[in-house]
Amino acid sequence: MIRFDRIAKRYPPDITALADISTEILAGELVTIIGHSGAGKSTLLKLIPAIERPTAGTVLVNGQNVGSLGRGALPFLRRNIGLVFQDQKLLFDRSALANVLLPLEITGFPHKEAQRRAEAALDKVGLLSRARALPIALSGGEQQRLAIARAVVHRPNLLLADEPTAYLDADTAQDVANIFIEFHRVGVTVMVATYDDRLFPGARQLRLDHGRIS
């Protein structure tokens, strides 16, 4: 499903984020990316939906070289990818339901179908009863679950998450981790950058150290 072939990523003036990364992620896998702060975890994830482009090497998603895609082709790549990053970018002046509806509205989904999908996504993460609440009224764990619901509302086959349990207490972190595990169990390919691999028992671990697989 995903193949990294001799990937390097450098930032000016002379910062190496990733160096000579070659690995493959199979469809349906649950993979955790482990490493200290600055190890390159976030950068590696951002290469997959072409948020970042590699300095060298090739990233293939379903056989497609994402680094060569033009701006017009990116929406077609990203519609099959769910993204959950540390900066959730929730709209705090809109309800939980409205936040989840937004990706479907942007892509022109019929309203009734969009409403049904958004409510189903909220239900999957245990937030349907809070559908009318503003994000400011939600706890940190609930806000993270809301971000997950928004990421999966378009039913992607690949789910990427960057430290989704950061700043959460132990019990809440495990609750959030379990949501990703459940999506993996129904066939979604899941990649999670995490500081605590114990939250994802049974996951294949990809360890990064100073931008290299260790």
Language model segments and positions:
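Helix-to-loop junction immediately C-terminal to a conserved catalytic motif
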Residues: 49
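Conserved ABC ATPase signature
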Residues: 134-138, 142
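A short, flexible loop at the N-terminus of ABC-type nucleotide-binding domains that lies
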Residues: 1-4, 9-20, 70
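A short, proline-enriched helix->beta-strand linker immediately N-terminal to the Walker B motif
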Residues: 153-157
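ABC ATPase NBD coupling module
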Residues: 12, 66-82, 111, 185
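Conserved ABC transporter NBD signature motif
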Residues: 57-65
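Catalytic Walker B motif of ABC-type/P-loop ATPase nucleotide-binding domains
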Residues: 159-162
